[in-house]
Amino acid sequence: MAAVGRYSGKVVVVTGGSRGIGAAIVRAFVDSGAQVVFCDKDEAGGRAVEQELLGTVFIPGDVTQEGDLQTLISETVSRFGHLDCVVNNAGYHPPAQLPEETSAQGFRQLLEENLLGAYTLIKLALPHLRKSKGNIINISSLVGAIGQSQALTYVATKGAVTAMTKALALDESRYGVRVNCISPGNIWTPLWQELAAATSDPRATILEGTLAQPLGRMGQPAEVGAAAVFLASEATFCTGLELFMTGGAELGYGRKASSSTLVEVPILPP
């Protein structure tokens, strides 16, 4: 848990803050002394977090709607007078799909939620972040860097989030605004549970997800929250950084072909 006072007096906006990683980020910043304004489409979940955590303000909102994001920023600045950090967390991972099962319409919708919502919020927040020399934290994904089977559209959106982070870090450095991203691997969240439940063997899916990390466990949302507070408060010489929160899942060299892959095995000479 983040230490009290590490981000005291600061104002933070978080998207998708009603559950999972988003709720953990909200909690971590509150524990660090910040005032947190967060949005989510889930109004009941957002109100529950707001009631639980003193120092939070919930504003119902959909990141695919620019008007909702304008309200989020204007209400934050009107209430607190400044803005120090934006965390673009809202996003979605569709169930497993083969490439031929995806659609352009579904891809556009996912781009709106996972990429364009973050872009829009950043544009709206930048005038205020430049004044405070604040920072932006985008939640990307490990698979944006290494790929993932049956997740073509999701991987594309998250790879774009990481690329946008690096480009923006260059542009905003002249204003003293830092821009970083966190790329989680397997974090045990409600979304992970839902995706596992949709598979033919949820227990096997969960075990496979657990064994993907050399550390032998999935990460916890609170660990991502702690990383976000670190990037905002103490990582003052970091910009354009992609911080892997993965338990080492990307490390090592091993089997990649699936059981259905046509394999050509070398033959030893006699």
From Swiss-Prot:
GO terms for biological process: L-fucose catabolic process; steroid catabolic process. Its EC number is 1.1.1.122. The keyword NAD applies. It comes from the Eukaryota. Optimum pH is 8.5 to 10.0. One of its GO terms (molecular function) is estradiol 17-beta-dehydrogenase [NAD(P)+] activity. Keywords: Carbohydrate metabolism, Fucose metabolism, NAD, Oxidoreductase. Transmembrane segments: none annotated. Gene3D superfamilies: NAD(P)-binding Rossmann-like Domain. Signal peptide: none annotated. InterPro entries: NAD(P)-bd_dom_sf, Sc_DH/Rdtase_CS, SDR_fam. NAD(+) binds at R19, I21, D40, K41, D62, V63, N89, Y154, K158, I187, T189, L191. It catalyses: L-fucose + NAD(+) = L-fucono-1,5-lactone + NADH + H(+); D-arabinose + NAD(+) = D-arabinono-1,5-lactone + NADH + H(+); L-galactose + NAD(+) = L-galactono-1,5-lactone + NADH + H(+). The keyword tRNA processing does not apply. GO terms for cellular component: cytosol. Pfam families: adh_short_C2 (PF13561). Belongs to the short-chain dehydrogenases/reductases (SDR) family. Catalyzes the NAD(+)-dependent oxidation of L-fucose, yielding L-fucono-1,5-lactone, which rapidly converts spontaneously to L-fucone-1,4-lactone. Does not use NADPH. Displays low activity on L-fucose, D-arabinose and L-galactose compared with rabbit and human. This is consitent with the low L-fucose metabolism observed in this species. This is L-fucose dehydrogenase.
